[in-house]
């Protein structure tokens, strides 16, 4: 008997990093690990970005599924083959109004109809959401919740966004048979804010793409170096440049570090970036600060491997994938206390208060090239993060699927 698993793929086809990376990595790991009696259907409101879809393995047991258009036809991804019988369009009398096909409305309400038609037995919400009414229709459900930052740190969100996220969170808890938390920190938050019994939550750490472990050749490093006009020595931070990421702390530590050491920040820039630039100018270190935006994923391994260390001063994260990427790239990491970053980096990374630039500078001096114990620290961290490699994570997720499917 075939097990048909549906997964929310909106972020998979739209988001290059973060939730998109989580979804693509997990799906690829599931395809490598699952038995042939598993069929995976990725449900997205549209085709999204072709370059992101192509990062998902082509596999006979995988298909992308999209909502019907107003003519009643089904759009199927031509790049990924699957069982075409699952894409039979609705008859004309079942055609849906145009408004039904908006991304939000379809993912919240309309998708359940598609799941039932396609014979989906279990649906996995990969980004903290489940459709309304799915549990009542007999489809088993599991949802991955990455973080509850909007509840822990409401100051980072607009009032209306907090209301919307809170509504989605409460609704999803009612629809979920089981919940996956990607860190123990997130698990505790779900129990605290959602009043969810612990037995309903499974802790499954997020997996990381192992391509960061691969050595980047000198030619590629030289090309990336020239493309971004990189300094000879730098520490790196990867992540959206927003208030929660606390980049100001790293900038304030720069005057306390060697003058030839620079800070390279890779990520999408939000208005907070202007505060970062202003602070760098005030401290006289603006020439040592490099903000890189629009960097393709293919350049990240070289950017990591040419750095001396990774600095991750975020005030709060659900997990902290860039820490694992940096460790796999052979870098020591300095991060901040207060959330789950110790879970991601392990005991051989260094952690400081998110409000103490002197402590951050002191920690960085302990891990720069030439520092005593640096290489041992890197090796110990690399051993620690092996637990986040894909097949182990996929096996845990498959065990959850099997637990729920056995209850049908």
Regions from the language model: what does each represent?
Residues 1-408:
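Carbohydrate transferase catalytic cores enriched for Leloir-type hexosyltransferases
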């Amino acid at each position: 008997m075939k097990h048909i698993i549906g997964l929310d793929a909106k972020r998979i086809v739209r988001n290059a990093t973060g939730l998109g990376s989580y979804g693509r990595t997990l799906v690829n790991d599931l395809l490598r690990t699952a038995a042939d009696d598993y069929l995976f259907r990725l449900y997205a409101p549209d085709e999204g970005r072709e370059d992101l879809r192509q990062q998902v393995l082509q596999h006979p047991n995988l298909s992308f599924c999209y909502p019907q258009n107003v003519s009643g036809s089904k759009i199927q991804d031509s790049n990924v083959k699957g069982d075409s019988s699952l894409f039979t369009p609705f008859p004309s009398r079942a055609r849906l109004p145009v408004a039904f096909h908006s991304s939000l409305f379809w993912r919240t309400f309309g998708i359940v109809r598609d799941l039932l038609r396609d014979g989906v037995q279990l649906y996995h919400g990969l980004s903290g959401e489940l459709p309304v009414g799915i549990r009542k229709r007999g489809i088993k459900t599991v949802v991955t919740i990455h973080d509850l930052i909007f509840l822990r740190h409401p100051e980072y969100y607009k009032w209306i966004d907090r209301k919307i996220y809170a509504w989605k969170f409460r609704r999803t808890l009612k629809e979920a048979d089981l919940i996956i938390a990607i860190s123990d920190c997130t698990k505790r938050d779900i129990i605290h804010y959602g009043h969810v019994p612990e037995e309903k939550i499974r802790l499954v750490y997020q997996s990381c793409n192992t391509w960061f472990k691969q050595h980047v050749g000198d030619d590629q490093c030289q090309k990336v170096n020239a493309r971004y006009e990189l300094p000879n020595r730098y520490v790196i931070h990867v992540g959206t440049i927003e208030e929660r990421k606390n980049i100001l702390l790293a900038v304030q530590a720069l005057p306390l570090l060697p003058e030839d050491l620079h800070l390279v920040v890779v990520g999408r820039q939000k208005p907070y970036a202007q505060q970062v630039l202003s602070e760098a100018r005030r401290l006289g270190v603006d020439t040592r600060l490099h903000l890189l935006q629009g960097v393709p994923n293919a350049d990240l391994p070289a950017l990591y491997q040419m750095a001396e260390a990774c600095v991750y001063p975020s005030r709060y994260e659900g997990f902290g994938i860039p820490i694992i990427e940096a460790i796999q790239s052979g870098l020591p990491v300095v991060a901040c206390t207060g959330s789950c970053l110790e879970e991601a980096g392990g005991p051989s990374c260094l952690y400081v208060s998110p409000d103490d630039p002197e402590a951050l500078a002191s920690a960085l001096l302990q891990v720069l090239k030439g520092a005593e114990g640096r290489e041992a620290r890197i090796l110990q961290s690399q051993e620690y993060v092996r637990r986040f490699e894909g097949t182990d994570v996929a096996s845990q997720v498959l065990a959850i699927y099997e637990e729920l499917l056995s209850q049908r």
